[in-house]
């Protein structure tokens, strides 16, 4: 039996609640399949498209005097509940369909960051919708948002993405796992909070990379494997070129060389690779599997996906 953290990519969860629900239903079957094989799993997820849409919608309402504007921390909490609810319901239904009595809980999770993290001066986390170049330039002019080209898929707004330091609800997560509860935690990388005087916390405008928080969570609970599910089936070098090559098996040293060669795009694949390296360096006996949401079953059989070891 293995203990596994499964990190679902926000981009892989679709562009609407309806599309996301259908994708989540299929994912639930694969995740429950892991449980029936005796594995203990903890689920995390991204929220880039979702938190961007929530923030955009609420700010649009505020601009038209239809309600207050909401900070990113609160938008992150909303996205945790929205995505977590659909995952939780789909997993409960799938477990019920096979006669398995297991509680599923979505835990609103805060993650401490450093308010002096240089990321606050260098926004890099893509969120929200994809735009063409002209649309992005127009929005940037009107609202002052920063946009970058995102892995050949269009232009997206970017926000600060500080490094996760600690998971505030870690002991609660451990207690739930110990009591045989299927936990959905650290959604969207966690709600970013900074430590104040007397050990209080306060939310801050940012979106933490979910893979980096998932790696931290995996190391903290000493899991055997981190599975990062994204929109592509392998990690590639020379991505989106005629010479692109899938990496089927690789190791930390090789990945560090590829990082030096700028093989991985900032804001998309690079944080996943950095998370994988961090997880393995903190947990040398562990491994990382990176593949697409649709190929999870095949990846678990070793037919597809990138496997990373020390």
From Swiss-Prot:
Keywords for the protein's UniProt record, in alphabetical order: Arginine metabolism, ATP-binding, Cytoplasm, Kinase, Nucleotide-binding, Transferase
Keyword Cytoplasm in record: yes
Xref: Pfam families: AA_kinase
CDD domains: AAK_CK
Chief place of localization: cytoplasm
Top-tier EC class: transferase
Pathway: Metabolic intermediate metabolism; carbamoyl phosphate degradation; CO(2) and NH(3) from carbamoyl phosphate: step 1/1
Xref: Gene3D superfamilies: Acetylglutamate kinase-like
Entry's family note: Belongs to the carbamate kinase family.
Name of this chain's protein: Carbamate kinase 1
Natural source organism: Staphylococcus aureus (strain NCTC 8325 / PS 47)
